[in-house]
């Protein structure tokens, strides 16, 4: 009962405020337009079979991967303890909902990982069984090596050849974060294994984010569109061109963050209407023919001021995006 009261105290004020602020529209949009389609089928090309999140968990939880077998074995062995029951009731129902939902994205079950960390911490209360140690060592080593190979693969496909040192460093750290803790774990040095996994794992993720990721230019489509608009003096926050920007064929939240919350993510007809109104438009190649046909009906000329090509990694599709403005205008004024 007290748990329900606490939840109501935390969620209630926010739920009431958002209901009043949107006149109930938030719930209609969130449940009817967003949640329901995700439960009914794989939405926006993000469908996957059950087992998808389970397969990704060792990779997304790395370097905690080392202790996942111990956490699961300990959870079953001590399921009668109140703290363990709490963590299980936190993890299992939530994870199963995400696993059984047709629409899946890797980050959906991340809130459940804290429960896994809770169970992993509980495993330190007693010596680990040989099964937990060897399973953790093997799983951690395997995932570390796969992530190391993944760094090299990403860099080979999308990276800058001059960043080979950064890729080598990140890959080496991921491999070390898997292999060194596994060696300690096999020698029953659980504390040393955990310290090595945490230390090297943090350094590996830091190297990936700070040194490797910035060089993966083809994956940074939204950031490159923002830069191209700024160069052409069409970026809304510059206050030169009419706003907002209309976008057809590329509807990613990262672009809204880059260009502003008023950015219009619609189709070719709406992008053409933006040009007619003197606003810039971004059009993906698949929508270009319809875009130009709509402009021809209005008798309006258009010119392409920049083009950005890359990979929409959220869908796995290559994209080619043209930035357009009305013909005859030399800048965004």
Q: What residue ranges belong to the model's regions?
A:
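Transmembrane-lumen/periplasm boundary regions of multi-pass, lipid-linked membrane glycan transferases
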Residues: 1-107, 112-126, 131-167
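Extended hydrophobic-aromatic, low-complexity segments
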Residues: 106-109, 120-121, 130, 188-196, ...
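Alpha-helix capping/termination and helix-coil
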Residues: 115, 119, 128, 187-188, ...
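Active-site beta-alpha connecting loops in nucleotide-dependent enzymes
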Residues: 135-139, 169, 216-222
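Internal/C-terminal transmembrane anchor helices
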Residues: 144-146, 174-215
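Hydrophobic alpha-helical transmembrane segments
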Residues: 165-170, 195-197
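Short periplasmic/luminal acceptor-recognition loop of GT-C membrane glycosyltransferases, typified by
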Residues: 195-320
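Core SAM-dependent methyltransferase catalytic element
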Residues: 315-332
């Amino acid at each position: 009962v007290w748990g329900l009261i606490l939840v109501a105290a935390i969620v209630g004020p926010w739920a009431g405020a958002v209901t009043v602020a949107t006149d109930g529209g938030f719930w209609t949009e969130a449940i009817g337009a967003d949640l329901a389609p995700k439960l009914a089928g794989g939405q926006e090309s993000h469908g996957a079979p059950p087992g998808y999140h389970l397969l990704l968990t060792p990779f997304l939880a790395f370097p905690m991967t080392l202790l996942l077998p111990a956490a699961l074995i300990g959870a079953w062995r001590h399921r009668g303890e109140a703290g363990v029951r709490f963590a299980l009731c936190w993890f299992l129902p939530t994870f199963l909902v995400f696993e059984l939902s047709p629409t899946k994205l890797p980050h959906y079950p991340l809130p459940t990982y804290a429960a896994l960390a809770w169970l992993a911490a509980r495993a330190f209360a007693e010596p680990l069984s040989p099964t937990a140690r060897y399973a953790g060592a093997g799983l951690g080593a395997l995932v570390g090596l796969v992530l190391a190979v993944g760094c090299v693969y990403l860099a080979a496909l999308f990276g800058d050849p001059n960043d080979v040192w950064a890729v080598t460093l990140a890959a080496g750290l991921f491999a070390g974060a898997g292999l060194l803790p596994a060696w300690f774990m096999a020698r029953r040095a659980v504390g040393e294994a955990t310290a090595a996994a945490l230390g090297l794992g943090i350094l590996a993720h830091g190297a990936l984010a700070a040194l490797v990721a910035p060089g993966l230019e083809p994956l940074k489509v939204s950031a490159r569109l923002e830069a191209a608009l700024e160069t052409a003096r069409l970026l809304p926050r510059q206050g030169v061109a009419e706003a907002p920007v209309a976008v057809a064929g590329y509807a990613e939240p990262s672009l809204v963050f880059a260009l502003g919350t008023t950015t219009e993510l619609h189709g070719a007809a709406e992008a053409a209407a933006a040009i007619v109104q003197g606003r810039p438009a971004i059009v993906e190649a698949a929508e270009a023919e319809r875009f130009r046909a709509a402009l021809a009906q209005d008798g309006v000329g258009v010119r392409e001021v920049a083009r950005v090509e890359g990979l929409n990694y959220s869908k796995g599709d290559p994209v080619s995006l043209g930035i357009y403005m009305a013909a005859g205008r030399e800048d965004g004024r």
